[in-house]
C-alpha cells in the first residue's frame, strides 16, 4: 500500500502538525485576503460620495469586486474552522474502517459508512475515492449534536460532516483495484492536470488587470475622475510590475504540462526538505535518478509538500528539461519544481512579490 500523509492519532487533533498546518494556512489566507478586502471596501465606500462620472463608477466597481472576491478568504476560514470552534479538535483523530455509499440520483450529499455503523454525510469533494481505495477515514466526533470532521490519507484538508441514520439502507460502492500506471491514467491526477493547463495562461493574471487599468485611466481623463485615475493607475502599475514574473510562471507551467503528458509512470524518490523560511521557495535535497540534486518548488502546493514532509517521498509525475511535475498518486494535486543537479543548498533569494499573496504558510512543517 502506498504511503500517504496521515494525521497523528496519539495527540489531540489540534496538536497534530499537519492539522496545525491546515489551520495555519486558513488563518493566513483570512488575514491577508481579509485585510485587502477591508481596505478596498473602505475606499469603495468613500468613492460613493464622488461625482458619478464613468471613471469614478468604474473605480467603485473594481473596488467592490476586489472586496467581494478577497472577502471569500475569511468566509472560507470561518466555515472550515468550525470543528476547532466546536471543540472537536480537542480529541485525537481516530482511524476508522470505512467505505462509501452509492450515490443516488436524489442525494445532495456524499455518504461515508463507518465500520461502527455510523453514517457521515457532507460535501466531501475528492475524499470519497481515497476512502474507498483505503477503506478507512480519520474522524473527530461526532459530538452530541452529530457534528464531526473527517480527513482522508494524502489530503491536507479537513471536511465538515454530520451524522446520518439508517446505514443499512445505503448500499456501499464496490472497491475496484486501481494499479499505479501512467499519471494521466489516474482520474484524480487528470483532474489536477486540467487545472495545471490553465496555469499556462498565468500571464493573463497580470496582463488583464494592466489592460483594464489602462482603460479605466482613459475613462477618467474626461470628465476628470480622481478615483478612476488612482485605481486605474494602481491596476496598470501592479499589472506591469507583475507581468515578467507571470510570464516566467507560465513558462514553468508549460514545461510541467509537457512533463506530465510525456510521462509513462510515477517515479518515487527520497527527499529531505530544508527548514522553510518566509518568502523563500520550499526546497529539498532529492535522490534523483541521476544523483543528488537540489529541488525547489516554484508554486508549492500544501498537499504535495505535507505528503513529502510526512513520508520523505516525492512522487514525480514527469520530467521536461530542468522541470519536474510533482503530485501525489490518487490525490488531485499537481505542482512543479526546478531541479538543480549542481547545487546542494538553496539560494537565499526572496520569491517575487506577486507570489507572496498565494504561497501557503509552511512554518508548521516538522523539522
Label each region the model flagged.
Residues 7-22, 261-278, 298, 339-347:
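Cytosolic/matrix-facing juxtamembrane and C-terminal tails of multi-pass cellular membrane proteins
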Residues 14-87, 187-259:
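Alpha-helical transmembrane spans
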Residues 88-106, 260-280:
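Structural detector for short beta-strands of small beta-barrel domains
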Residues 126-184, 302-367:
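A membrane-cytosol interface segment of integral membrane proteins
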Amino acid at each position: 500500500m502506498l504511503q500517504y500523509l496521515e494525521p497523528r492519532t496519539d495527540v489531540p487533533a489540534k496538536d497534530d502538525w499537519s492539522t496545525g498546518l491546515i489551520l495555519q494556512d486558513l488563518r493566513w489566507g483570512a488575514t491577508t485576503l481579509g485585510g485587502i478586502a477591508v481596505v478596498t471596501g473602505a475606499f469603495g465606500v468613500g468613492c460613493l460620495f464622488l461625482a458619478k462620472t464613468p471613471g469614478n463608477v468604474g473605480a467603485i466597481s473594481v473596488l467592490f469586486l476586489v472586496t467581494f472576491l478577497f472577502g471569500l478568504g475569511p468566509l472560507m476560514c470561518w466555515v472550515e474552522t468550525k470543528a476547532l470552534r466546536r471543540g472537536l479538535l480537542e480529541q485525537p483523530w481516530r482511524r476508522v474502517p470505512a467505505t462509501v455509499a452509492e450515490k443516488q440520483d436524489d442525494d445532495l450529499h456524499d455518504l461515508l459508512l463507518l465500520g461502527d455503523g455510523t453514517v457521515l454525510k457532507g460535501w466531501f469533494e475528492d475524499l470519497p475515492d481515497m476512502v474507498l481505495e483505503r477503506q478507512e477515514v480519520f474522524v473527530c466526533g461526532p459530538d452530541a449534536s452529530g457534528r464531526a470532521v473527517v480527513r482522508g490519507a494524502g489530503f491536507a484538508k479537513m471536511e465538515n460532516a454530520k451524522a446520518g441514520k439508517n446505514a443499512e439502507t445505503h448500499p456501499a460502492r464496490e472497491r475496484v483495484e486501481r494499479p499505479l500506471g501512467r499519471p494521466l491514467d489516474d482520474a484524480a491526477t487528470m483532474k489536477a492536470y486540467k487545472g495545471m493547463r490553465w496555469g499556462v495562461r498565468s500571464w493573463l493574471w497580470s496582463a488583464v488587470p494592466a489592460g483594464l487599468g489602462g482603460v479605466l485611466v482613459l475613462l477618467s481623463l474626461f470628465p476628470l475622475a480622481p478615483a478612476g485615475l488612482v485605481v486605474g493607475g494602481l491596476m496598470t502599475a501592479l499589472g506591469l510590475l507583475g507581468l515578467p514574473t507571470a510570464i516566467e510562471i507560465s513558462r514553468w507551467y508549460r514545461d510541467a504540462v509537457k512533463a506530465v503528458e510525456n510521462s509513462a509512470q510515477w517515479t518515487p524518490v527520497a527527499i529531505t526538505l530544508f527548514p522553510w523560511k518566509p518568502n523563500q521557495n520550499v526546497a529539498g535535497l532529492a535522490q534523483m535518478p541521476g544523483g543528488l540534486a537540489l529541488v525547489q518548488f516554484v508554486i508549492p502546493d500544501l498537499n504535495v509538500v505535507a505528503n513529502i514532509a510526512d513520508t520523505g517521498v516525492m512522487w514525480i509525475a514527469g520530467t521536461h528539461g530542468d522541470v519536474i511535475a510533482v503530485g501525489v498518486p490518487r490525490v488531485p494535486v499537481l505542482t512543479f519544481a526546478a531541479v538543480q543537479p549542481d547545487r546542494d543548498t538553496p539560494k537565499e533569494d526572496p520569491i517575487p512579490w506577486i507570489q507572496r499573496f498565494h504561497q501557503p504558510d509552511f512554518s508548521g512543517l516538522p523539522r
